[in-house]
């Protein structure tokens, strides 16, 4: 396995670990999710280019579309929570009381 794949998998694992460590802040969780999506995009692009899958060149672009939608929804949720409660701590929120 080339070292570029190991580096990208390590970046994904680091972002996943960051999500687990910084789960109390919504902004940190969103940044770690974006890091995971970016590493998945790069890894899928490299695999498709190395394996010459001509029929699945659209997969990384579809992944970027979903990442952009996830970022937009996450930032809208962050703005709503910070305007309502004045902070972005997830542990202090009870989302069942809408």
Swiss-Prot record:
It comes from the Eukaryota. It is a multi-pass membrane protein. GO terms for molecular function: NADH dehydrogenase (ubiquinone) activity. It is found in: Mitochondrion inner membrane. The chain crosses the membrane at residues 2-22, 29-49, 61-81. It catalyses: a ubiquinone + NADH + 5 H(+)(in) = a ubiquinol + NAD(+) + 4 H(+)(out). Its main location: mitochondrion. It holds the Pfam family Oxidored_q2. GO terms for cellular component: mitochondrial inner membrane; respiratory chain complex I. Keywords: Electron transport, Membrane, Mitochondrion, Mitochondrion inner membrane, NAD, Respiratory chain, Translocase, Transmembrane, Transmembrane helix, Transport, Ubiquinone. GO terms for biological process: ATP synthesis coupled electron transport. Its EC number is 7.1.1.2. InterPro entries: NADH_UbQ_OxRdtase_chain4L/K, NUOK/Mnh_C1-like. Belongs to the complex I subunit 4L family. Core subunit of the mitochondrial membrane respiratory chain NADH dehydrogenase (Complex I) which catalyzes electron transfer from NADH through the respiratory chain, using ubiquinone as an electron acceptor. Part of the enzyme membrane arm which is embedded in the lipid bilayer and involved in proton translocation. Core subunit of respiratory chain NADH dehydrogenase (Complex I) which is composed of 45 different subunits. This is NADH-ubiquinone oxidoreductase chain 4L. It comes from Propithecus tattersalli.
